[in-house]
Structure formats: C-alpha cells, structure tokens
Amino acid sequence: MKFTEKSVTTQLEILKRKLGGELFEEIKLDDTAFTGGVCKAGSPIAADGKVDKETKPIGILITDVYKDENPNGTILRAFGVVNSANIQTSTGEAVADAVKTALPLIVFE
C-alpha cells in the first residue's frame, strides 16, 4: 500500500466574524507573492496576484497558499470583518493604514 505522510498545522482564523454576506473571490497568485513557497493568510493582494501593502490591494488573502500545491487563493473583497491581531501574527506585520484605506468595505478589528 502506498501512502504519503504529511504534517498539518492549524492556522489562525483571519475572519473575525462570519456574517454570511462576505464577497470572496478566487485569484491566481503571482510567483513574487510567495516567500519560502508560501503566501501567508492576511496578505493584501492586488489585482495582478502580487502582495501589495501600499498602493492598490483589492482584497485580503483568507488562508495560507502553497506554491507547490496550488498557487490559487481566495481573497475577501468586501463585506467582511477581519482580525487584525491574527493578520499580524500570520504575516509578521501590522495591517498598513494604506491597505485599510484601499479596502473601505472591510472592517479591521
């Protein structure tokens, strides 16, 4: 019998509250979005699939995305409440004011 053993860890929940009306969108991440083969949940993502912490992000990545497994991710575009503390823990950085300004339909708590 063949099998593959894989270690799985849990990740922090980026959504603080699930309201039921969130606008999610699938997006293919650019190769530059990955650091060490992973793009961390909570990263602000631009329309071209790159991490964009300053200019024009269109959403927040909901879960970690692994380049080797599947370079596609899901972003929250609007009508959601995210946990800023969990984003900072996941990405290693606080959410920039420019990101909050660019995403007015997402509440950062």
Stretch-by-stretch model annotation:
Residues 1-109:
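Surface-exposed, low-hydrophobicity beta-strand/loop segments enriched in small/polar/acidic residues
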